[in-house]
Amino acid sequence: MSSSTQLVRAVIPVLDLMIGQIVLAKAGNRDEYRPVETPLTFSSQPLEVAKAMFNQTCCDWLYLADIDSFAGASPNWNVYNELLNHGFGLWIDANWMIDDRYRHIHEKIESPERLEIILSSETLSSLDQFSTFTQLIEKGIQPIFSLDRKSGQTITQPGELSELAPIELVKEAYNRGVRSLIVLDLDSVGTMKGIQNKDVGVGPLIQEIKQELSDLRIISGGGIREVEDVKSLLDAGCQHVLVASAIHELKLTPDDVMEFPVSPFDLGSGRSLN
């Protein structure tokens, strides 16, 4: 296995960072986020929560949403570096389009070899901005495109993207070199309402994307309540599933997670090796 190849478990624990603490997200309503209360740890500090979630799942790659950045605050570089320096791999969503802050990643991040950058649809307004994916790849940073959905619609900034079908946005990112995609129903986040089957919610969209672009690494989540929900998304074509509440509610154990496939992923090319 080459030095750029990472083994990534199917479950990706989620950290929502707000005012220096980990909060529990619910249905994408950021005004209602509160510091996490979890039996895993007495702390809401990022590193302590990350270590506690690792102890519960044995998953060392994390999805980190920097909530304050979406209100215009600067990225929390200190937290990113603290987690990376403790051996975690990070997928970071930090509204990278504001002031072209993605251009500062190399000077701010101390260990970029276990870092992937998420560009979410809600931060993009034009097709021209998709060139950012290419720029990141040229700098050796693997981007992930996040297709954010709410009330059955894709969330974008006002502009031409709001007129495009989800599959068109995904294809545009794919044509710019993206090989990892998040499909996320924000209405389901933090609700633990479960995944019914592959024919509802984001299921049909995931199937459409897999048929069109079979080599995409697809990630989804939202509403996960138990092991069977993780299995449902994996069966629908996902390689990874984002989970927060179910971990804090002790619905997933290390033994559960070990039963799911591990995906070798080449950070150099951005491709899943399965």
Kindly give the residue locations of the regions a language model identified:
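Catalytic cores of alpha/beta
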Residues: 89-113, 117, 126-133, 204-240
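Hydrophobic faces of well-ordered beta-strands that scaffold small-molecule active sites
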Residues: 9-18, 62-64, 90-94, 115-119, ...
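Catalytic domains of carbohydrate-active enzymes, especially glycoside hydrolases
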Residues: 50-65, 175-181
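C-terminal helical cap(s) of enzyme catalytic domains, especially alpha/beta-barrels
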Residues: 130-133, 234-274
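Short catalytic helix/loop segments, enriched in acidic residues and glycine
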Residues: 29-51
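Charged helix-capping and loop-helix junction motifs
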Residues: 74-80, 159-168, 194-207
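Conserved anion-binding
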Residues: 14-37, 103-190
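N-terminal active-site wall of soluble small-molecule enzyme domains
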Residues: 55-109, 202-203
